[in-house]
Structures are given as C-alpha cells and as structure tokens.
Design a protein with these regions (language model features):
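Propeptide-to-catalytic entry region of secreted or membrane-anchored zinc metalloproteases
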Residues: 36-148, 152-157, 323
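Extracellular fibronectin type III
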Residues: 401-419
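Beta-strand-rich modules
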Residues: 386-402
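Residue-level detector of functionally pivotal "anchor" positions at catalytic/ligand-binding pockets or at interdomain
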Residues: 317-335, 415-436
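Active-site-proximal segment of zinc-dependent metalloprotease catalytic domains
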Residues: 137-214
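The catalytic-center signature of Zn2+-dependent metalloproteases
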Residues: 186-290
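Conserved aromatic anchor
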Residues: 345-353
Length: 513
C-alpha cells in the first residue's frame, strides 16, 4: 500500500476549531481507486454527544435487536462537476453504490431510497476543492432537509477518500445537519466506504476509538467481557470505553490492515487483543469487511427511530409508495436479426410494471460501450454513439427510487448498417421553411411554416433504412400548411424530404408509441 497520511490528535483539535465538529473520514493513499482498501479513514474520535447517547442505549439493545420493522431512509444524491460540466460520475454509477449500500444494510433492516433523480452541481470550487471550507459551503447551500445528503466529488486535491458527520455536528442547520461526502475513486459499487461513512452518519464510532492511542491506558477498552473480574484484574468496560459496544471485540489497530492480523498487543489485564476484521467500522481491508454487529445495528436504528432521536427527522416524512418491479422489460426493437442505422438508431421496449425510469446498456465484444438512463420506453441514439457495420448487443431494466438493484433483460444482439445521413436538417441555404413537431404520435399533423404559397410542394417519407414509405404533394394557399401522415406508421425514426421550386429540405422525425 502506498504511503498513508497520519493524523495526530493535535490535527483533529485544529480541525475541530476550523470545521466545527467536522470529522473527516477516509484519507487516501497515493494510489486512488479502491474505496477504503487503498486509503485510511481519518475520522476523529466520536464527539461526547455521540458517546453519551451510545452509553444511554446499553440497556435497550436486547429490545432493539428484536425490532423487526423495516426503516426506510430518504437519500438525496449529488454529483459534483467542474463549472463547465466536466468530470463527475454517471447517475447509474451512483445508483450502483446505493444498491450496494442497501444490500449491506439488510441485516439492520434499514433501506435507503432516492427521493428524486440525482442532482448535478457544476461548481469547480466544490469539484476540485483543496480545503474543507468550499465543501462546507457546498453542504450549506445544497442540502435537502430531512434527507441523507450524499455528495460525490473529486477529493484528490485534498488526498481524501471521503468524510461524514456525526449527528448534530455538521453544517446545514435544523433537520438538515451534516452529510456524507464521497470521492469518485472511493465510490466503487462493491466498496465498503459508503457503508462505513453511513455508520458514522448514524452514530457509529470506529471499533478502535479511545484505544488505539494507548491500548494499556486505564481508560482504553479492555479485552475481557466479564463484568465481575476478580482483583487485581479489571472488569469489562466495553459499554463505557472504546466504541461503546460489547459485541465488537476490543480493537487497537488505527491503520489499514490485512486479515488476519499478525500484530500482537496486550491490554492492561495482559489479555491479547483479537480485533475482528469483519466489521465495517474497523480499519481492515475492504475484502475483510462484511457486517455490522447487532448492537451497532440497534444503535443506528435508535438514531432514526423516534422524532426525538438524533436523526429522527429522517423518518418524519412518510416514504413514498414505490411500485414493485415485476420481471424485466420486454424489448421491441432491435431484435436479434435486426439492423439499425448507427447514427439514427431507435431502441424500444414495453413498459415494466413498477418502473418510472429505465437503464439502457449497449455492448460490443462484451464491453459496455454505452450506458444511459431514460424516463420513457424508447431511446433515440443519434450521432456517432454507434459505429457502422458492427455487431452489438443490448439490455434494459426498469428502476424506481426504491429499487435500484433490479435485473436486466436478456441480452440481444443486433447489427448496424453504414451511416445513412448525418445532421438534423439538410436545407437549401436560402429556404427558411420549418417543420414541427419532429416528435409525433398517431393522428398528430405536422405543421409546415415559411413555405411559398401557390407553388406545389412535393414531400417524401423514408424509414430509418432509407426505404420509401409514402409520397405526396400539397398546394399551399399561404405560407403555412398541415401535413397529415398515414395513421398506421410503425413507431420509429423517419426522414421527411420537402421540395418546392428548386429548394429542398430534409428533417428527421420520430414517431412515438
């Protein structure tokens, strides 16, 4: 692993004064890209308010772990880009991180749903921040109240993997405090950083809190879980020291470690520390982590499960009712034997029950070359997104804010022809005629404007492969006319050519379902 940045206690004291209870979370090594596996977390010790709250929960854990009601928490996701719109990550990549987050929180019976589509913020001072102040401003200006605000941005200028705020410690104000900020390089779909940061956001300290600086200190968490040790041995203090959880073994390792660990450390009783690498709130490598403890899960639930809880405002607004996604979308076009024009390709599918958004992926040689989200049941690929005379395949799936883990349809192959034409219009330079709408449904007439009255106008409609569909002529009486196309036109893309008095115009049309 590349060199790490080590934060001293004095550093955290300075940061506390500067940031007002901001606890940084996940400092990267010099090689970005793999969530926590290549970077240390820099979150400081949990604030006193968090520790007091966790201590108050100790007697309630048995009842909490028997609570089987699911808690649904609202999320607002933000993608930060430069002021020119450069950089960032895709909306579908954010969906993948939320899907992964939900899978990791299943044992806690907590799920996260998106309240709306991902928000894009184009601001270079937030995108390439080299200090915390712009990010504090970002949160103050953009947080959506009563939701968990997650920001995805470029933190490489600060060598950070991400950071989060404990309850009641961050910017944003009443029922709006704090956020989770993730770097792009740490937002891998299978990474554990986001689960780790949500743990902090929901009141979980690191497993080594208050122990790593001096494992033999009397206030450090001891290994024993016996509350009635015989002197001179000291009894267990796991509910009032360390991370305040007695079902997470005492931990002393405050740097990234591979599992199993070969480090040897004794506590004040002379007992050997045996930290558990499987906990998300430890510093073990990503491939070691897989769970929260029952008491950790109970504490996170308690943090949101009543109006008076530290983040109880997250459950004040009833969650929306999302439809259940049934099956996968049935594809209409292209099918296995179909050929499409690469610069004018229309992809169509039937609506899927419960979906209000669709994700379309196109592959070449099993490589995903195109990935987009559309709110309708078709996508019109224009320009050079596809290459001519090639073999491709495609899949589509339905999504909604409550289910970002749905299955894709089976993959079907298709071919592309050569490019048929380019550009939206091909007009005679002096002819200013207009055709609208260019997106139409059955029965919609097309309006022709700025044509010459009294001069015959000839029109021809061809399909996406250049085949003639129908022709006709008009005798306009003034500078405008209505053109009624056949009502039985299949859904798809077309080319309308107009000719009048040595002038010519070509317009792309799209017949909608």
């Amino acid at each position: 692993m590349t060199s790490m940045l080590t934060l001293s206690l004095s550093f955290f004291n300075r940061m506390h004064r500067v940031l007002g209870m901001l606890w940084i979370a996940c400092i990267l090594g010099l090689t970005p890209g793999f969530a926590q596996s290549n970077g240390e977390c820099g979150t400081g010790p949990a604030p006193a308010s968090t520790l007091r709250y966790l201590e108050s929960l100790a007697s309630t854990y048995d009842a909490q772990t028997e609570d089987t009601v699911w808690i649904r928490l609202p999320v607002t996701a933000h993608i930060i880009r430069s002021s020119s719109g450069f950089g960032g990550m895709s909306e579908s990549a954010v969906f993948a991180t939320i899907c992964n987050l939900n899978e990791r929180f299943v044992p806690a019976r907590i799920s996260f749903y998106l309240t709306e589509r991902v928000k894009f913020i184009d601001n270079t001072s937030f995108y390439g921040a080299t200090s915390y102040q712009p990010l504090m401003t970002m949160i103050d200006q953009n947080n959506v109240p009563r939701t968990i605000n997650i920001y995805y941005t470029d933190l490489s200028g600060m060598s950070l993997c991400g950071f989060a705020f404990y309850p009641l410690t961050g910017p944003g104000g009443f029922q709006n405090d704090g956020a989770v900020v993730m770097s792009f390089g740490c937002s891998q779909p299978q990474g554990t950083t986001l689960a780790h940061e949500l743990g902090h956001y929901l009141n979980l300290p690191h497993t080594f809190d208050e122990t790593s600086s001096n494992p033999v200190d009397p206030i450090a968490e001891r290994v024993t879980r016996n509350f009635n040790e015989v002197a001179p041995r000291l009894s267990a203090n796991c509910f009032t020291a360390g991370d305040r959880f007695c079902d997470t073994p005492s931990d002393f390792i405050a740097s990234r470690w591979a599992c199993p660990s070969s480090r040897v450390q004794l506590d004040l009783n002379g007992d050997l520390f045996r930290p558990d690498s499987s906990y998300y709130m430890s510093y073990s490598n990503d491939n070691c982590m897989s769970r929260f403890s029952p008491q950790q899960m109970a504490a996170m639930r308690a943090t949101v499960n009543s109006p008076s809880a530290p983040r109880g405002y997250l459950t004040l607004t009833p969650p929306p009712v999302f439809g259940t996604l049934v099956g996968t979308p049935t594809k209409i076009f292209p099918q296995i034997t179909d050929t499409v024009v690469p610069n004018n390709a229309l992809f169509r599918w039937h609506p899927q029950q419960g979906a209000n958004l669709y994700q379309l992926r196109i592959f070449q040689f099993n490589v995903n070359v195109f990935d987009t989200l559309v709110p309708d049941t078709f996508y019109h690929a224009l320009g050079n997104r596809l290459r001519g005379v090639r073999q491709y395949s495609w899949v589509v799936r339905g999504l909604n804010g409550g289910d970002l883990c749905s299955a894709f349809s089976p993959r079907d192959s298709f071919s592309t022809s050569t490019y048929v034409f380019a550009g939206i219009n091909e007009n005679t330079a002096s002819w200013q005629a207009k055709v609208y709408p260019t997106l139409f449904r059955e029965g919609d007439p097309l309006t022709l404007a700025h044509i010459q009255p009294g001069i015959p106008l000839v029109w021809k409609l061809t399909d996406h492969l250049g085949r003639q569909v129908c022709v006709g002529n008009l005798q306009p009486e003034d500078s405008g006319a209505l053109l009624h196309l056949p009502g039985d036109l299949p859904t798809g893309s077309y080319r309308l050519e107009l000719r009048q008095n040595q002038q010519r115009m070509t317009v792309k049309l799209l017949r909608l379902p």
